Regions:
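N-terminal intrinsically disordered, cationic/polar leader segments
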Residues: 2-158
Length: 158
């Protein structure tokens, strides 16, 4: 899928070029809102997709690392694995009232093991953070491009 000019939201991570670090971004297509992560590995793309999702709630740079949460999911299909991973992130945010700054992901076959790093939601420190009770993951896509970079994207409705 290619982007048309003006479709990237401001606040996206740094640009990705071969050899460059991973990035995340928000993409709009009409009324649809997508989160997208890119990286040199599938794991890096999943980390960045989770960053994009969390950035819809609070600016990750405003979040301190005070807690670590372990997350795990499994699926033989990368698209389904992405959806399950993002659901696990949202569940941790909603059930524990946390906001996250960063993620570390490791994959072993069909299983994904992740660590989310962040802090409890504090209205004084995070006055503009959105409350997350759930998310609808409408469509997910995972692929490796001709440039060798992995992309993981998902349409979201908070």
């Amino acid at each position: 899928m290619s982007l048309e000019p003006g479709q990237l939201d401001e606040g996206a991570g740094p640009a990705v070029t071969p050899g460059a670090p991973a990035r995340w971004e928000h993409v709009t297509r009409g009324s649809e809102r997508w989160v997208r992560g890119r990286g040199r590995s599938l794991e890096a793309a999943f980390e960045q997709a989770a960053m994009a999702l969390c950035a819809l709630v609070e600016d990750p740079s405003a979040v301190a690392v005070r807690e670590e949460v372990e997350l795990e999911c499994a699926s033989p299909e990368p698209d389904r694995l992405l959806a399950d991973w993002l659901r696990a992130v949202v569940h941790a945010m909603a059930s524990r009232h946390l906001v996250f700054r960063c993620f570390a992901v490791r994959r072993d076959g069909t299983r994904l093991f992740g660590h989310a790093f962040g802090e409890p939601l504090d209205r004084e420190r995070h006055p503009f953070a959105r409350d997350v009770r759930g998310v609808s993951l409408v469509d997910t896509h995972v692929w490796r491009g001709a440039d060798g970079l992995w992309t993981a994207e998902c349409e979201v409705e908070l």
